[in-house]
Amino acid sequence: MRLITGRLAAAALVSLFVLTWRAHVDQDVVVAQTRKPIMITRIYTGPDGQSRAEQVELKLNGGASEMIKATGVQFSSRPPAPASDWHVGPMRQYVITLSGRAELEVAGGKKIPVGPGHIDLVEDLTGKGHITKVLEDRVTLQLPLVDQTPRSN
């Protein structure tokens, strides 16, 4: 009797493990199928000298992007501040917001809300530039790119 009870208990534990594992795997599949693409806000200078913004999907091949060469890494912390004057990017770079909120403005009054996880590709190195307004303490990671030639539109 003890042997049968032990085997039933072991079978129940194995069944529970299999059901739990199966539910976890099914959940991972659903997450993978509904995963959103990684989007980047590209800020660039249009032919009229005005800064523009567009959403660009980061291409992933096998779950990773191609290697992007950067010249270094810089962290920046900024307190809330009124909107800056119009300015161009200092160099072609990625700016990734780690915490806080800001707002970018480009030509035509288009405003881009920026929060944690937001990625900007700053390419407006000439022309009128853009405005930055820090709304909450903002920490960013800046990755200046080796290739300083903005891609053509």
Question: What is each of the regions a protein language model found here?
Answer:
Residues 108-125:
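Short acidic-glycine-tyrosine-enriched beta hairpin
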Residues 104-105, 122-123, 128-135:
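Short beta-strand His + acidic residue motifs that chelate non-heme Fe in jelly-roll/DSBH
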Residues 87-104, 144:
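Short, conserved beta-strand element in jelly-roll/cupin
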Residues 9-18:
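Hydrophobic membrane-insertion alpha-helices, especially the h-region
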Residues 57-61, 71-89, 123-126, 147-148:
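Conserved short histidine dyad/triad with adjacent acidic residue
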Residues 17, 21-78, 153:
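A short, N-terminal "cap"/entry segment at the start of jelly-roll beta-barrel domains
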Residues 120-122, 136-151:
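A short hydrophobic beta-strand segment most commonly corresponding to one strand
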Residues 1-10:
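Bacterial N-terminal signal peptides that target proteins for export
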